[in-house]
Swiss-Prot record:
The protein's name in its UniProt record: Malate dehydrogenase
Annotated GO biological process: lactate metabolic process; tricarboxylic acid cycle
Enzymatic class: oxidoreductase
Domain of life: Archaea
Gene expressing this chain: mdh
Protein family membership: Belongs to the LDH/MDH superfamily.
Length: 325
């Protein structure tokens, strides 16, 4: 199947391209850049071709600066946008990136009307809403990377703390991809044992030293921490994107936490895009999976909805003047 990446010369776009090129389900990978970055885009394809040959991988690689070449794509990944700096809040990007995402969403709807759109551009929850409205697609076919990467980060930190394999940690982060993210600690388990039991029994000596508040702060600040040291996040987002894309192409029906339009499924929240667990299959989102939250988690989730909704309304009002629907 064909997958297109818009913004393929950016650091996340490049890393994502290499990840997806190695996936058997991806038969054609089309990399789209701005016209002024076309030479770099060509170079990326040539370099990637050599790498894939060394691994014995055969995939058709294409590149262009023309958005109409998304035609025939099963999935279009939008990574294009102004990158975030370490001292910049994701919401600071909203107005600039809103214009970029809105324009691309319109063109995707025109040239690839049957495709699925995966939004990566930050602030991802707001940009997912923008892409949804400007594409006119059904919500099942437009969603964002959301809290999938945040969930993986939390799993990783907890696995390292308790010295267990990451697959033994079952946890999830929902809400906003940002300060209002909600780690669902109340339903977290390690090796099938609810984490709350670790406080009552000596399963692992590390439990009493586990600082939940610091761990949550670590997840929230993970992106900024990486950006301040190397200038951008690349590999984490790329592999998380690859998880989502291959889940769809292989019709795996996995439950992943992505940013999607809320329509009352959780706590009656509507008309805002938030990270929640969904079942993903070949046609996109097959349904939102209900979650159990304690009182504090529910309160933070509602705060996330309020914050993201306010940010989204401001961006949509701005876009209504710049790019009327």
């Amino acid at each position: 199947m064909k997958v297109s990446i818009i913004g393929s010369t950016g650091r996340v776009g490049r890393a994502t391209a290499l990840c997806l090129a190695e996936e058997e389900a991806v038969k054609t990978l089309h990399l789209i850049s701005r016209r002024e970055s076309l030479e770099q885009n060509i170079g990326e394809v040539l370099d990637m071709s050599d790498a894939l040959a060394a691994k014995g991988v055969s995939v058709k690689l294409e590149n262009s600066a023309d958005i109409e070449n998304v035609h025939g794509s099963r999935i279009v990944v939008i990574t294009a946008g102004v990158p975030r700096t370490a001292d910049m809040d994701r919401d600071d990007l909203a107005f600039q990136n809103g214009v970029i995402v809105a324009e691309y969403a319109r063109q995707i709807a025109r040239f690839a009307p049957d495709s699925i759109i995966l939004v990566v551009t930050n602030p991802v929850d707001v940009m997912t809403y923008v892409a949804l409205k400007y594409s006119g697609f059904h919500p099942s076919r437009v969603f964002g990377l959301g809290n999938h990467l945040d969930s993986l980060r939390l799993k990783n930190y907890m696995a390292r703390h308790f010295n267990v394999h990451v697959s033994e940690v079952h946890t999830r982060v929902i809400g906003q991809h940002g300060p209002y993210m909600v780690p669902l600690i109340s339903s977290t388990s390690i090796g099938g044992i609810p984490i709350e039991h670790y406080a009552r029994r000596d399963y692992f000596s590390g439990y009493r030293r586990f600082d939940l508040k610091k761990t949550i702060e670590k997840v929230i600040n993970a992106g900024s921490n990486i950006i301040s040291r190397k200038g951008a996040t690349e590999y984490g987002p790329a592999f998380a994107i690859s998880n989502i894309v291959t889940t769809i192409l292989n019709d795996e029906r996995r439950i992943l936490t992505v940013s999607t339009l809320m329509e009352g499924e959780i706590d009656g929240i509507r008309d805002v895009c938030l990270g929640v667990p969904v079942k993903l299959g070949k046609n996109g989102i097959e349904g939102v999976v209900p979650v159990l939250m304690d009182r504090d988690e529910r309160e933070t989730f509602r705060e996330a909805a309020s914050h993201v909704r306010n940010s989204t309304m401001k961006v949509m009002e701005f876009l209504d003047e710049e790019l009327p629907l």
